[in-house]
Amino acid sequence: MARHSFFLLASTLSSASTSTLFTTAFSALPVPVRSNNFNKLITRNMIFGKKEFPAPCVMGDESIMSPKAHGTSETPVQKNLRWNCDYDTADRICNFNRHYAEYAGYWTTTTFVEEARKEYEEKGEIMFYDSNTGKPLFVAPKGRDLNSFLKESQSHGWPSFRDEEVVWENVRCLSNGEAVSVDGTHLGHNLPDGKGNRYCINLVSVAGRPDGA
């Protein structure tokens, strides 16, 4: 169905060309000039072609996304994903993909916002679990309220997390900005802005249930 189709920046390009395009786009992201260590590091990376992001971001290497039993992961996504996320879309994005994403605004078509408000009222935060393994990947909001988290996510089209909202035990960032789980789940990308690292994440990648329940 159209609503579950993937978004590609330039669908007519070959995979190799697309990879180059995405890498180039992320390397050339504009960052406001400010006298802080974050912007100094990002600016230096852009000038000298280095691929690293400042702490607390934890870097990983390509071996994380090496072929496994099910694409880049050992298992398919869970059957009963949260927020009525589509299984087929989730499995393709999580396990057989490095560049595609759910379409912008997809997360608002699910039951996420309604259920997130309830969870936030009860617990003061929302847990986001790996759609494959059920391991915790993000906890939000932190350092802001739910409305601020939703507003930022709405403005970018995808759930958007900050450094303090990442469970770094289970998440890594690759040199091209790709955000992945330590088990090989494609999550999205790190797209730094003037506030710091911003992790633009597919909802279908973090719609798992704890421990695969």
Q: Would you name each region that the model predicts?
A:
Residues 1, 26, 30-32, 187, ...:
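Generic hydrophobic secondary-structure signal
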Residues 1-30:
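N-terminal chloroplast transit peptides
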Residues 7, 15, 35-36, 41, ...:
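Low-complexity, intrinsically disordered regions enriched in charged/polar residues
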Residues 17-19, 37, 116-120:
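Intrinsically disordered, low-complexity coil segments
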